């Protein structure tokens, strides 16, 4: 694990983490304000969009997808049983009951979990393996972020062709138009419309529950499909096709990790309550209703979700489902912004321009991510054309991330919670068996589109690990021959002229003299009255207490070493943090303070460390990283950049 980044940005990343979950658009700490019911409604609007829109295509694709099952009672009952118990074991037990207990100062999500784990595994030989798994899950998350908006919106809009077959040629243009509009409004922020997400999703879940219940009433015996023995019977009678069908059945639990990822925004109790009391029953009723419809009318397989509606309600259902799909897509896009911000802080991704669309924490817009996602999503729609084709690509990213979560959970159980081995192993064995089976079933869909998230994942994993490794090599090379600060201050105090004001030199580590200071002495031959060597440290916690915000060491003669600490969910507002520093001489006056940054130009070489092509890739990423001045919110007219060359 690294403990710093480079002089170029002066920050120190003390942990690396990953994410495979979605993050909400709400601010941190929301669960401490307002009544439980209000927070539960908010959670329904953000957390459950992905899993909530699964009924649009999950059951249909089990019987009409790439690995079709016979449409008979054995397989209908078996799949409904499999979906129900998957939701109970994976979502309700694994995520809601177990993983949601593993919070990092109230924050959830795999990034927060990995940062928490790092505190207990730093320096361990196997710790790096856990980190790499986490990084790969982050890469899979980005693949998921590309597929979810495409499959959700397309799955909803395909209802147009169900009711009006002559409008089928308009589906792809409609989907592309909606998605382009969705990505274009991101820069304006979604705070004003976000207040409607909860009520709209309440209407959606209420609607699918009622439609499902009405269909169940037409064939009440379908309720028996909830018994686990029907899934077992199906696998015994038809093991191979049952296994292949798991590739589509897993669609019923996509988005499960969002419950954990958004815990910091809404709190554990509101999410649990909304899932157990409202969302889960609505999903179960709808899946049972679709099963009842297929038993009574096999021709409804074209779209059992939409054929549940009576004729007079068909277009209203299409509108409600389309709104739900857009909301689900919005939650994923906001999650991609949130994960990227955390990954930047934790040292996995180069600095990017981050724009705040609201005063509320978490309301951010990252242009590079937004436009990259938009291009990828539209390409997926144009290439795959139908949601049933896209679902083949969907499952691998989801099941891969879920399997990796088991490894992270294992560390939590043994290292953090100190569980006894028999209980931990028994529970983990169940989780690993289920997730591995689902992943194996989805691997059979690689030729049908499953290769898409794998290729995306490997490409993004390469970028993330190249950046992380490149920064580590830079730190190692810069540390070679570093002059101790106490030695430097004794000689510099007597040999350089002093000028009025304060100079802050951004440093990557809390040891040695930063290259910007050495270059300033070499070229300008002066020192300011007060010289502060500043390191920004990103901690393994989401938020740092104000009492632990900074530490100062006074070297005398106007020399100070200052460390500012930020959590991985906080903005690195250096001028704002400096206002609270009281042990570094007189208070900081930004108009009398100059910030000195060092900008390295990398020269790829044949030195050991990374392959030459990765060194060139890293150099390109570094050149295109956002300005440290902007990232740390430094006043533009008070910054001096000094260049240097560095071989890696």
Swiss-Prot record:
Keyword flag Transmembrane helix: yes
Region (Disordered): 1-31
Molecular function, one GO term: potassium ion transmembrane transporter activity
Superkingdom of the organism of origin: Bacteria
Subcellular location: Cell inner membrane
Membrane topology note: Multi-pass membrane protein
GO cellular component: plasma membrane
Family: Belongs to the HAK/KUP transporter (TC 2.A.72) family.
Function text: Transport of potassium into the cell. Likely operates as a K(+):H(+) symporter.
Annotated protein name in UniProt: Probable potassium transport system protein Kup 1
